[in-house]
Structure formats: C-alpha cells, structure tokens
Amino acid sequence: DTRDQQISQFAASGLGRITINAGKSRSYGAGASLRASLTNELSLNASYGYTYATFTDYIVNEEDKDGNLTVKADYNGKYVPFVPKHTLNIGGEYAITCKPRSIFDRVVFQANYNAAGRIYWTEQNDVSQAFYGTLNWRANLEIGDAMISFWARNFLDKDYAAFYFETMNKGFMQKGRPAQFGIDLRCRF
C-alpha cells in the first residue's frame, strides 16, 4: 500500500505541471525472466512482468460558493496512470565465429520483441494504450576492435501512443517512434 500517492498533472492554466496528492493506492505484481544458451552460438531470453496498481482512497471534493463539499470525482478502484499492466520481452542472439582469414572475426544477429500494456493515461481510465509490441533487430559485423552494426527499431512500424496528457480541456497524444533503421560504426582503443 502507498499512502500519500502523488501524481503529476498539468496546471488548470495549461502552463506547466503540478504534483497533486492522490490519496492511497495499492500495487502488487510479479516478474520472471529466463535466459538459455541452447548452443555455443544460439541463446534465447524472455522476461515478463505483471503489475496491478489501483487507487484505494482517492476522492476529489469540490467546494461550492456556500462552502459545502461535494464529490467531484471518485477514483477508487481505478488503475494508477502510466503503469503498464504487462511488460514482455522475448529475444534471441545467434553468434557465428568466422574461420581464420575471413573478412570478419564474428557475425552476430540479434532480435527482440518488446511489449507493454494496457497503460491508462488518466485517473478516470478513459484513455489508454492497449497492449502493443515492437520488433527490433541488429546485425553486427566484427573485425578486431571494430564493429559495423545494421539495426532496426520498431521494424514492423507499429502505431502506438508513447505518452498522453490533457490540458486546457484537450487531450494530446505523443505517438511512438515509427520504424527506424541505422548503421553504427564502433572502434575500441
């Protein structure tokens, strides 16, 4: 249990963020991970996390002009914003040690699938990102102390919300990055 839970919101003016008290919340969860080397060349890994985080005492009262308090919002039982219920990573690596006199010393292929969701963006739980995942890969070509890497992030160009906020009675969503491709050159001294 968390007492004096605090969350961040945009100020009513829309200028800047403020931290507000959100009463109490309860969070529990579990996680597991596994890594296996199937051969000298091939290794696999997986991890999973589950979190259940809800408000247990979060009521917003409003005072009328006569000084009477009325319940403006009751968030008890609602999921705490920005906490993914599930996280998942599945990946693998295949490393080839090349023969002497080859151009490369080693060639390594890596791929992983990262996923998260459902993520609620508001205390009302009226805006959320469903469970989603991105596929990423990398191919490394190693020569002595040098390495050339070809890589892709969000290879399948999954459309998802990376962030959401509300200000001045409007909602704004930041989309996740689209598919990205690149080349890295590294040299160790």
Label each region the model flagged.
Residues 1, 11, 50, 152-156:
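A short beta-strand motif that forms part of the nucleic acid-binding face
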Residues 2, 15-17, 75, 155-156, ...:
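Residue-level signal for pocket-adjacent positions within structured domains
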Residues 3-21, 26, 33:
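Membrane-topology and secretion signals of cell-surface/extracellular proteins
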Residues 5-14, 51, 56-63, 119-126, ...:
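Outer-membrane beta-barrel translocator domains and adjoining extracellular loop/strand segments
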Residues 5-8, 23, 63, 138, ...:
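Residue-level detector of intrinsically disordered/flexible regions characterized by low predicted structural confidence
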Residues 9-12, 22-24, 44, 82, ...:
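Generic structural "secondary-structure junction" signal
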Residues 20-122, 186:
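Gram-negative outer-membrane beta-barrel transporters
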Residues 78-189:
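Conserved C-terminal beta-signal and adjacent last beta-strands/turns
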